[in-house]
UniProtKB/Swiss-Prot annotation:
Taxon lineage: Bacteria, Bacillati, Actinomycetota, Actinomycetes, Mycobacteriales
Pfam family, any one: IPPT
Annotated binding of substrate, by residue: T10, G11, S12, G13, K14, S15
GO terms (BP aspect): tRNA modification
Gene3D superfamilies: 1.10.20.140, P-loop containing nucleotide triphosphate hydrolases
Protein name: tRNA dimethylallyltransferase 1
The protein's required cofactors: Mg(2+)
Length: 314
């Protein structure tokens, strides 16, 4: 069975559409959902990632949720291997895999079957020492000197990816982007639906989403995760919302600090959405749908369009 991928920026309604499509397909063929949100891989990171509760999943099987402890590092290579195995197993059962998420590297590594450059522990350790000694800003500047294109696509605060880029450049003697495959035919013949809407509409959704997370207990969730090792996590501790709350708690956790964390989470999410849009819009395989209207008839029409693309994509 050809998979369907539903991608797009945070807050565009991907999870809702995936459930609606799976329910519509149920009378014809069962569907199973494969998560492609990097932070939903973590157990206990529920409120801040808008992870669907078991009750909200409508009885539809979900994969790649709650598979890591917060102290573990979520690598794209590990995700690709595990998620691809899930998809192969779903297809073997005669079911439809629905890939859902907005983590750019995770989505593309899966759909384009990336092969990852080898690693060298000694080379990586040396760059990690440089990171510790010089700081993330100076190391990003070093990356910019060696590979300006890579530096332009990696956040100056993302020490882990900066180290990885420098490692790959040193090992291969080529720019970091040279190790990434070009966009071609999607693996398994996957049909790709992209959801997006006008920026003012999405900004309003992100504001409501952020407020809801804090009101539903994001701060307490972070406190619980700290006891589970969140501070030791290379990737989990940097997640939007969690990083901001963690910094506020470290500074004393007063109401004003937490209000500032809420505001920083909102603006950080808006910046992340811009990156998601830039990344996904360059993929010519994506069939884009306007997710601005969310009434019952609009949801039905969106399911119709997703299934039309899934049935007829070439």
């Amino acid at each position: 069975m050809r998979p369907l991928a539903i991608i797009g920026p945070t807050g565009s309604g991907k999870s809702q559409l995936a459930l609606d499509v799976a329910e519509r397909l149920a009378g014809e063929v069962p569907a199973e959902i494969v998560n492609a949100d990097a932070m939903q891989l973590y157990r206990g990171m529920d409120i801040g990632t808008a992870k669907l509760s078991v009750a909200a999943r409508r009885g539809i099987p979900h994969h790649q949720l709650d598979v890591l402890n917060v102290a573990e590092t979520a690598t794209v290579a590990r995700y690709q291997q595990a998620a691809a195995a899930d998809i192969e197993a779903i297809i073997a059962r005669g079911h439809v895999p629905i890939v859902v998420g907005g983590s750019m590297l995770h989505v593309q590594s899966l759909l384009d079957n990336w092969s990852f450059p080898a690693t060298d522990p000694a080379v990586r350790a040396r760059w990690e020492e440089c990171l510790a000694e010089l700081g993330v800003g100076e190391l990003h500047a070093e990356l910019a000197r060696r590979d300006p294109a890579a530096a332009a696509t990696i956040l100056p605060t993302d020490g882990r990816r900066i180290v990885r880029a420098l490692e790959v450049i040193e090992l291969t003697g080529q720019p970091f982007a040279a190790s990434a495959p070009r966009i071609g035919a999607a693996q398994w013949g996957t049909a790709i639906i992209g959801l997006d809407c006008d920026t003012p509409i999405l900004d309003d959704r992100l504001a409501v989403r952020t407020d809801s997370m804090f009101e539903r207990g994001l701060v307490e969730e972070v406190r619980v995760l700290l006891r589970a090792g969140l501070r030791d996590g290379v990737t989990a501790a940097r997640a939007l919302g969690y990083a901001q709350v963690l910094a506020a708690l470290d500074a004393g956790g007063g109401a004003e600090l937490l209000d500032d964390a809420r505001e920083q989470t909102y603006f950080g999410t808006r910046r992340y959405v811009r990156r998601q849009r830039s990344w996904f819009r360059r993929d010519h395989r994506v069939h884009w749908c306007d997710a601005g209207a969310t009434g019952p008839s609009d949801r039905v029409a969106m399911v119709d369009e997703a299934l039309r693309v899934w049935r007829h994509v070439t």
